[in-house]
Structure formats: structure tokens, C-alpha cells
Amino acid sequence: MLLPVAAAAAPEGACDGVTVGAADTAAYFPLLRGRRVAVLANQTSRVGDEHLVDLLHRSGVRLTAIFSPEHGFRGTADAGEHVASSVDERTGVPIRSLYDGRTRRPSDEAMRSFDVLLVDMQDVGLRFYTYYISMLRMMDACADFGRAVVVLDRPNPNGSYIDGPVLDMKYKSGVGALPIPVVHGPVSYTHLRAHETG
């Protein structure tokens, strides 16, 4: 089950101009009540000045796992660098790396540790940006294990700009997983997934 929480224009008079999906807690907190929650997140997973994981922890959400993509949960690893699993110092929640050099798919044990997955990462609208690929792999694993997925959308900073050839799927890899242009502009995570599954 996929439940998107869209980003939206901020109310008139707001200084930021955009409300990210993670800030709309009224839309997704009811879906988390009484459930074990995992997040696929990184350093961009912010709600104002607070990290999404800290917000969930402070709000009493039963957070059982953090999945981290390339560059790690705090975004400190270099491109392509393998990142070990660890524990978040602030919350004590296990961080399960999807970029450890062994596998890019979570273990069966990790998948059994939660009921619903929140996805919240900023994408820049480039086909070779690996965050959407990590999300797709997690969504596939969630489908296999019957886990719900809630995508907390963020606006694409590339706006409506689209450029470059569409990926020929015979070249599908860890830096290109969908038949989309190099710069895919306004295509959100949810639309990427819908495109992949037809």
C-alpha cells in the first residue's frame, strides 16, 4: 500500500513558500498510530529546524528502524563510499545501511522489524541521483513483505526543467533504474514509481 503525502504551497503570509510532506503531520500521524515505524531518511529529512527522526521520537511514534541511503543517515560519507549500519545516538534507533557494499536491499530481519515505512529524502531531479533508487528498492521489499509505504514528498528544486535522453533499460544500474530523462524535472517520487509499474 502506497500513501503519498504531497508537498504544497505554504499558506499566504508564510515565509518559506513551501510546506514539505513531512510537515503535514495531521495527514500521516494517524497512519502511524499503534504501528512499528521505519524511515528511509538522510540529512535532508528536515521539518523546519528539526530532523524527521527527532520529530517522530519526540512525538512518541514507535520508531523501530532507520534505513540510510548513499552518503549515510547524516550525509557525511563520500559518493560511493560504503557505510556501516549503526545506532542513532540521539534516539537509540538502529540505522540499517542500504549502502554497505554487501547488499542494497534490506535483510528479512530488518523488514520484519516494522509495519509501515516513511520515505523522506530530497531529490534533485537527476536520473543518476541514487536516493530514488534506494526508495524503489525499499518499496519493492515492502511489497514483498506486505508493508505499507508513506512517501513524504518534497518539491523538486529543478522545477519543470526536463533534459537529456531517456534511459535505455538495457543499461539499468545502481545509477539509473527507470526509463526517465537525465533531468526529470517535476516528476515526484510517487510519479516515478507509478511510471515504473505502469
At which residue positions do the language-model features occur?
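Glycine-rich oxoanion-binding loops at beta->alpha junctions
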Residues: A84-S113
